[in-house]
Amino acid sequence: MKLLKRLVSVFAIVLAVGSNAFAGDEVRIVIDEGVDGARPIAVVPFVGSAPEDISKIVADDLRNSGKFNPIAVSQMPQRPTSAAEVNPEAWSNIGIDAIVIGQVVPSGNGYSITYQLIDTVGASGTPGTVLMQNSYTVTNKWLRYGAHTVSDEVFEKLTAIRGAFRTRIAYVVQKNGGSQPYEVRVADYDGYNQFIVNRSAQPIMSPAWSPDGQRLAYVSFENKKSQLVVQDLNFGARKVVASFQGHNGAPAFSPDGSRLAFASSRDGVLNIYVMGANGGTPTQLTSGAGNNTEPAWSPDGNSILFTSDRSGSPQVYRMDASGGSATVVGGRGSAQISADGKTLVMINGNNNVVKQDLTTGVSEVLSTSFLGESPSLSPNGIMIIYSSTQGLGKVLQLVSADGRFKASLPGSDGQVKFPAWSPYLTK
């Protein structure tokens, strides 16, 4: 039996910070557009009962990636409880080449989760072959995490891409009233298990994760001026790392976590600077006319993307991380490069989320929601979260990188904006 103590350690850090600041009104996924055309798969209801529906969580995760289209339970030709009970032909006849079965049973002060991934068409040799199996013991609090672990393993086995269902998102909520209406929150990628990291009477903006997932940098106006704050998620300790005259904003950790790129108008014009992650004397990278903001590092740390209106309207530019000349990339702003360096996501002139292949230069519009902002990629590049305007407020939106699946994560207690997807939080 495999215990998830090591795997949940980083998640426990966030829970420790938020243990006295639970946010009851969570953001939850509401499907806007399904995954027709994705690979059909079956996640058979797990045997046994628990406070969380493990098989539904697994099916939802696979669906959210845009790579899979889990069939409804009512469409399943059988509901096997073991590999021996699986009739491969019954599944292959309806176009299903892999199924997930499992069970969840009480174990001590928690539950044991066991699953098997089964090949129904013989792609691995013989129909009915168990492609993968595993079991975990988790406490009640970590049931969803255990389900996300199943999802990650199944996803990676079937796609050869590391799953990102055990990652988290940080975002800002502006509540409807109260003495401290601005909050930085962290939640599972799907909006569950939400906690407040910090709250303030003054605006908070632009949270950014450190590459080890243990710190958040964000913009705070708590002292009546914009400051960059880095908060340790182990202990909750906060440090102001930039409080220069003028505006200080848009922090971004370098890939090795040692530096922060940010925008500041300390000299009268908004420019891109780089300094140590713990503060210090900044180095100015951009200059000249126009405002420069929203820096984002390339995966190798050698270059920085940023938004500038130097040409008269906002566009995304790219320059060496040590400074120098900049070249136009395109789009309107909020650029981010995938971890493999192959894909760029950004906002275009119509305020839509766009994906650009950096090898071919081909672009694809992924969203047509109103006033899209702040797109953030999952660490495997498979999903994108961003904010948009619905009615009179801001909500989070999720879209798969292939555009197949779209969903909203509306907040019930205020406007939700500035999403940032965490790095991988497990080894």
From Swiss-Prot:
Subunit structure: The Tol-Pal system is composed of five core proteins: the inner membrane proteins TolA, TolQ and TolR, the periplasmic protein TolB and the outer membrane protein Pal. They form a network linking the inner and outer membranes and the peptidoglycan layer.
Keywords, ordered alphabetically: Cell cycle, Cell division, Periplasm, Signal
Species per Swiss-Prot/TrEMBL record: Haemophilus influenzae (strain PittEE)
General function of this protein: Part of the Tol-Pal system, which plays a role in outer membrane invagination during cell division and is important for maintaining outer membrane integrity.
SUPFAM superfamilies, A to Z: TolB, N-terminal domain, Tricorn protease N-terminal domain
This protein's record includes keyword S-adenosyl-L-methionine: no
GO cellular component assignments: periplasmic space
Pfam name, any one: TolB_N
Protein name per its UniProtKB record: Tol-Pal system protein TolB
Signal peptide boundaries: 1-23
Gene Ontology BP, a term: protein import
Designated gene of the protein: tolB
Keyword Signal listed: yes
Subcellular location(s) of the protein: Periplasm
InterPro entries for this protein: 6-blade_b-propeller_TolB-like, PD40, Tol-Pal_TolB, TolB_N
Family: Belongs to the TolB family.
